[in-house]
């Protein structure tokens, strides 16, 4: 099947593909069969209508059109391989010649991956913070366990700091009840400052059955940011008694006999988490360093479509949270404070993510990185765990939305990134060289002998660290305040290291750089005392 390539611009080409009619015959036969199964013609059983009759009654053009549509994807894919280009979007296809019985010619204009060389990754060095766990972090974990196993006793006195109260909240404005600012049976710790401003002062000194009123700004739901008059009624006051931190406590909340053992285990868990963050930071920095050494010109169409998709995704997340951009920025960790700068930052992160995908895809191609069945299975189970679904449901979703190519691409990118980081020199702030390929998904470090005995393909998964987290902007309750995380660019697992601030929405969108078809042990036990 002859084909030629014309370069229209740096990142766009036009393929001209000539398809002899004998190569179209299988699609023609299929078209006749499909049409025969769909139409009713007097004198013929369904599915048994001869080709000449179909031509006579419905026209040869109908058959040719269906046959060409069926044959185009394979012809286009073959031309892509023959001309060694990597498409970055859907092609614009036009049939330019159709000589019945002779030849079909069509053109396909498509954006392609920029031509660039990868730098020598072995020459790249990055430094990340050393893994350190302050005593204060361990103390905080111990305090969390004390809170979990505290004894709450109902009392008949007035509420005081650190008491647990059960309250009803009713919001009004100009005497009108605000349903979205009303809640019953809410448990609240006095002095925690975790809900409405003024609530702590209002409930302090109230006994069960007593009420107080105050004015505040709502911090969640559709009325977020609006002022309202709030009436709070205390229905129950409980005194909270925290257990002493002794060996009995350690035996109650953990698998250990002493407090020292429990604290050591908590510290280890925190170190593992910090190690995963350290590995992610290393991947970020290595990938950013690689990208900084490459001049990549992204296709305009690709940029426009990605930015529009990202803007829609962010707006959807904000709508689900009942927030405007301005309201989001008030409580978020974003480094910008106005909408224009926010969208500019979103654009920058999106473009960085696209560049990361393109770089990792090229490395995967250059290194001929493949995908094993066990890697697909691991990804399936990981996604099911992340999304709170069963492996069967996740597999069904994948098949329904044709996500298999996306999953394979995600795995290849992850392995390419692992290879890239493994080739670079990574040290911590104390000058220690890091062996990121020995870090397990739970943050532990693999035994060297076990690592040598493990299958080679496992190393990519270990180096990739934590699985991709798909977070969604959650709708805030009318009377509860929370810190909002950053919103960032959507990326695949392989490209996640370009930024750490990721809020991903589960999407059926195909990745921008996909080849398209045409058109251990833990200190805390389960709390069973509740």
UniProtKB/Swiss-Prot annotation:
Annotated spans, Disordered: 432-530
Major site of localization recorded for this protein: cytoplasm
Swiss-Prot/TrEMBL keywords: Cell cycle, Cell division, Chaperone, Cytoplasm, Isomerase, Rotamase
Segments of skewed composition (Basic and acidic residues): 459-478, 501-512
Reactions the enzyme catalyzes: [protein]-peptidylproline (omega=180) = [protein]-peptidylproline (omega=0)
GO molecular function: peptidyl-prolyl cis-trans isomerase activity; protein folding chaperone; ribosome binding
SUPFAM superfamilies named in the record: FKBP-like, Triger factor/SurA peptide-binding domain-like, Trigger factor ribosome-binding domain
Summary of the function given for this chain in its UniProt record: Involved in protein export. Acts as a chaperone by maintaining the newly synthesized protein in an open conformation. Functions as a peptidyl-prolyl cis-trans isomerase.
PROSITE patterns membership: FKBP_PPIASE
Protein name according to UniProt: Trigger factor
Naturally occurring in which organism (per UniProt): Cutibacterium acnes (strain DSM 16379 / KPA171202)
Segments forming domain PPIase FKBP-type: 162-243
GO terms under cellular component: cytoplasm
Keyword Isomerase: yes
Gene: tig
Domain comment (free text): Consists of 3 domains; the N-terminus binds the ribosome, the middle domain has PPIase activity, while the C-terminus has intrinsic chaperone activity on its own.
Location within or outside the cell: Cytoplasm
Homology family: Belongs to the FKBP-type PPIase family. Tig subfamily.
EC id: 5.2.1.8
């Amino acid at each position: 099947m002859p084909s030629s390539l014309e370069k229209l611009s740096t990142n766009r080409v036009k393929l001209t593909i000539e398809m002899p009619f004998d190569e179209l015959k299988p699609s023609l036969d299929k078209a006749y069969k499909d049409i025969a199964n769909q139409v009713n013609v007097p004198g013929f059983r369904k599915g048994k209508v001869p080709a000449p009759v179909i031509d006579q009654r419905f026209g040869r053009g109908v058959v040719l059109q269906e046959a060409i549509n069926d044959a185009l994807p394979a012809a286009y894919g073959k031309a892509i391989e023959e001309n060694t280009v990597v498409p970055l979007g859907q092609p614009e296809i036009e049939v330019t010649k159709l000589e019945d019985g002779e030849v079909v010619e069509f053109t396909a204009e498509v954006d392609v991956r920029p031509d660039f060389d990868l730098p020598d990754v072995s020459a790249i060095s990055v430094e990340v913070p050393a893994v350190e766990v302050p005593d204060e972090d361990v103390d905080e974990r111990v305090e969390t366990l004390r809170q979990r196993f505290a004894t709450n006793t109902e009392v008949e006195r007035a509420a005081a700091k650190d008491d647990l109260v059960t309250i009803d909240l009713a919001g009004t404005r100009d005497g009108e009840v605000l349903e979205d600012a009303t809640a019953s049976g809410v448990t609240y710790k006095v002095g925690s400052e975790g809900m409405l401003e003024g609530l702590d002062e209002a409930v302090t000194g109230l006994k069960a059955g007593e009420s107080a009123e105050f004015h505040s700004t709502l911090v969640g739901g559709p009325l977020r940011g609006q002022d309202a008059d709030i009436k709070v009624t205390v229905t129950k006051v409980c005194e909270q008694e925290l257990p002493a931190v002794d060996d009995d406590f350690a035996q109650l909340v953990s698998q250990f006999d002493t407090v020292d053992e429990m604290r050591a285990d908590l510290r280890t868990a925190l170190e593992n988490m910090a190690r995963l963050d350290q590995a992610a930071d290393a991947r970020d920095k290595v990938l950013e360093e690689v990208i900084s050494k490459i001049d990549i010109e992204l296709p305009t169409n690709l940029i426009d479509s990605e930015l529009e998709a990202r803007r829609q995704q962010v707006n959807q997340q904000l709508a689900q949270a009942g927030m405007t951009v301005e309201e989001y920025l008030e409580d978020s960790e974003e480094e910008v404070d106005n909408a224009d700068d926010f969208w500019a930052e979103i654009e920058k992160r999106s473009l960085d993510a696209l560049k990361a995908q393109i770089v990792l895809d090229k490395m995967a191609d250059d290194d001929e990185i493949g995908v094993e069945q066990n890697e697909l299975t691991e990804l399936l189970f990981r996604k099911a765990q992340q999304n709170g679904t069963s492996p069967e449901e996740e597999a069904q979703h994948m098949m329904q939305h044709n996500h298999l190519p996306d999953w394979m691409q995600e795995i290849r990118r992850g392995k390419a990134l692992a290879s890239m980081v493994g080739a670079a020199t990574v040290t911590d702030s104390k000058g220690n060289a890091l062996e990121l390929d020995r870090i397990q998904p739970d943050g532990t470090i693999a035994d060297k002998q076990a690592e040598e005995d493990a299958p080679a393909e496992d190393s990519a998964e270990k180096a990739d660290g934590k699985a991709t987290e798909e977070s969604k902007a959650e709708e805030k309750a009318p009377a509860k305040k929370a810190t909002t995380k950053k919103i960032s660019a959507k990326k695949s697992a392989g490209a996640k290291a370009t930024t750490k601030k990721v809020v991903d929405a589960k999407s059926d969108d195909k990745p921008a750089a996909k080849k398209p078809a045409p058109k251990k042990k833990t200190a805390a036990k389960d709390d069973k005392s509740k």
